[in-house]
A protein has these predicted regions:
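Conserved ABC ATPase "signature" region
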Residues: 106, 121-139, 164
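ABC ATPase nucleotide-binding domains
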Residues: 242-271
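Conserved ABC ATPase signature
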Residues: 118, 143-147, 151
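Catalytic Walker B motif of ABC-type/P-loop ATPase nucleotide-binding domains
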Residues: 168-172
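Helix-to-loop junction immediately C-terminal to a conserved catalytic motif
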Residues: 54
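The feature captures the beta-strand-to-loop junction immediately N-terminal to the Walker
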Residues: 39-41
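ABC ATPase NBD Q-loop/coupling interface
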Residues: 63-81
Length: 271
């Protein structure tokens, strides 16, 4: 994967939980205006890799760079400097009690605050836009402890968008969402990339990756099986190797997008 125009890069990363390596020698780059999807079976290292790019999991070996700055060690960016440029939506976040949706979304502006100063005009506009994009404006004054899982997912995403970073990292952003909001969130992600944001997103749904990704990184057992554009990576051979099940890949007759279907013993067979 080319490092041209790369905003965030991982080089030869070895990531471990305790003594066990869960990512072994992986390199990747997130480029401006590009959606890079990380796909693969459970336990393949996707979320750990994303957390390392977000400076939440220090590599045993290798390095992460944001532009020409290192993320750890000498000359590393400060926490606020990093947070002004990179944000991460994780899969699991604690649900705060006694705070409103607006409060949680406003928290995305914390890298820009100093002392007791509140949100400035630009920050208020960013909060409004983030809530509009994720469809949570009408619930702004509701307590977040009253929300469903899907509603809460959209609120946390709005908080990330309010941060206005050049790099957006998303771990399963369509989790818990019904079909309408899955489509809307995927559209938002694509729109942000079209505006120049570098997006790295973990997805379990291969069809979602086919819809929005420019580049795909297919992982299995902590290593890269294939990387490249959708057509290069989402193939029967690569997917069957990574997932350990036969995967039929075809173009949707209506949209033309690649469609991936795993074939079990009772699955209808393609003609």
């Amino acid at each position: 994967m080319s490092t041209e125009d790369a905003l965030l890069t991982g080089h030869d990363l070895v990531l471990a939980h305790q003594e066990r390596a869960v990512v072994d020698g992986v390199s990747l780059s997130l480029r401006a205006g590009t959606v890079t999807a990380l796909v693969g079976p459970n336990g393949s290292g996707k979320s750990t890799l994303l957390r390392s790019l977000a400076r939440l999991h220090k590599p045993r070996e290798g390095r992460v760079r944001l532009g020409d700055r290192t993320v750890w060690g000498a000359n590393a960016l400060s926490g606020k400097e990093f947070a002004r440029q990179v944000t991460l939506l994780t899969q699991h976040r604690p649900t705060p009690s006694g705070v409103s949706v607006r409060d949680v979304v406003s928290y995305g502006r914390y890298p820009y605050r100093s002392g007791w100063r509140g949100v400035d005009v630009d920050g208020a506009a960013a909060i409004r836009r983030a809530m509009d994009l994720t469809g949570v404006t009408l619930m702004a004054e509701r307590g977040v402890d009253e929300l469903s899982g899907g509603e809460l997912q959209r609120v946390w995403l709005a908080s990330c968008l309010a941060q206005q970073t050049s790099v957006l990292l998303l771990d399963e952003p369509t989790n818990h969402l019904d079909l309408r909001y899955q489509v809307e969130i995927l559209d938002v992600v694509r729109d942000l990339a079209n505006e120049g944001v570098a997006v790295g997103v973990v997805l379990h749904d291969l069809d979602h990756a086919a819809i929005i990704a420019d580049e795909v990184v297919l992982l299995s057992e902590g290593t890269i099986v294939a990387t490249g554009d959708i057509g290069q990576v989402l193939t029967t051979g690569h997917l069957s190797q990574a997932y350990g099940v036969t995967v039929h890949v075809a173009n949707d007759p209506v949209t033309g997008a690649i469609h991936c279907r795993p074939l079990g013993r009772h699955s209808p067979r393609p003609a």
